[in-house]
């Protein structure tokens, strides 16, 4: 049994929290929204995951120090725009050498940092830990499916191979297969850039175009992402894997995908 602290109680954070709890881990979830914590702990239901029952063993807290202290893994599951501010709040309580897992996807506009680069920057400031072990967890994963134990694959990415393998071991179970990859930059870049292509695919659908156009956008889209990644020092093979083409396919084709749905509405002229 591992002790896991999760910062963020959105759909992805809660789907993972349930999965990790069912696997026998001691999981504690924190949210900056106190009403959210009250509702989740009382109703044992998440409003955006109606089919998911929150296990009685899964615990909640409003205290950020409590969620950070004495944990084998500290998982950041807040939206990308809140990763830096949440890291700043957590900084005084993060232990030296702590394994930090990020599941948010995106690029910070002002710095062009990936999410783990933001965490390294913010946690490295005065009053923070003396080094952390950063892992990005990314792939073709909709929370709606993980929440009801549908088969899923994901990538644990870090240049720290031992940390990536530790996360692989903790998150693996009968319905979740975890692969490792040392190319954390490529994995994170894939997770951010696929949203742009998925939006375009949705727009093409909304305009009434067919499968031919969607296939072209997905295929040429991953080629563009790969070229950008290689120029930034990433491994080209990353983009042909789960975190690359895999994540792009699921985001560009599924109605679970907000980017796909938004694109469809744009294409129809409804937004």
Please provide the spans of the model-predicted regions.
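NAD(P)+-binding Rossmann beta1-loop-alpha1 motif at the extreme N-terminus of oxidoreductases
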Residues: 1-53, 59-62, 89
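Rossmann-like NAD(P)(H) cofactor-binding subdomain of soluble oxidoreductases
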Residues: 54, 61-69, 73-149, 167
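Internal alpha-helical scaffold of NAD(P)-dependent oxidoreductase catalytic cores
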Residues: 82, 93, 118, 125-133, ...
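Glycine-rich phosphate/pyrophosphate-binding beta-alpha loops
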Residues: 142-143, 205, 248-255
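Histidine/acidic-rich helix-loop-helix segments that form or flank divalent-metal centers
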Residues: 239, 245
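Divalent-cation-assisted or electrostatically stabilized phosphate/pyrophosphate-binding catalytic cores
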Residues: 254-271
